[in-house]
A protein has these predicted regions:
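A binding-site-centric feature that preferentially detects glycan-recognition modules on secreted/surface proteins
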Residues: 1-149
Length: 149
């Protein structure tokens, strides 16, 4: 299982994070008003794991399977930092982050997804309540190990 290491909470805004990832396209609703980059408690290391299913799955089914593997749901910030540090991953197929969904303008609950269109890296929003097709990899977080003092 590949683990991707990122660090959240470096003080950048959502707009700065999106710009740093150098996407060819970013959904117009992914900005600080809708997805404010939270400060956490300073720099926060995270371990991202991508799960792949051989059949269409709901967000609920994917989250249940992730929990069985000891994984937790991501934050939307995980997607923003992941796209900066690992730009090539989305070129191999879409990556969806099943964070707490954002209620979009038309009443759809959305999650941030990273994908490519003819080799152009893109950041978009997809329906959290739709089925995720087998070509999607769903991002979850390995909980931090307790540190000993």
């Amino acid at each position: 299982m590949t683990v991707y290491h990122i660090t959240l909470g470096d003080g950048r805004t959502t707009e700065e994070l999106v710009a740093a990832a150098k996407y060819g396209y970013c959904h117009s609703q992914v900005f600080s008003d809708n997805f404010p980059a939270r400060p956490f408690n300073g720099k926060t290391p995270r371990e991202i794991v991508l799960l792949k299913f051989d059949h269409p799955v709901s967000s609920e089914e994917a989250t249940e399977e992730a929990a069985k593997q000891g994984l937790e749901r991501p934050y939307y910030e995980d997607a923003l930092y992941f796209g900066i540090k690992y730009p090539e991953v989305q070129l191999d197929g879409p990556v969806a982050f099943l964070h707490d969904p954002w209620l979009g303008n038309h009443g759809r609950r959305d999650a941030i997804c990273l994908w490519n269109n003819e080799g152009r890296r893109e950041l978009g929003l997809e329906g959290f309540d739709d089925l995720w097709q087998p070509n999607y990899r769903l991002a979850f977080v390995r909980p931090a190990s307790p540190t000993s003092d």
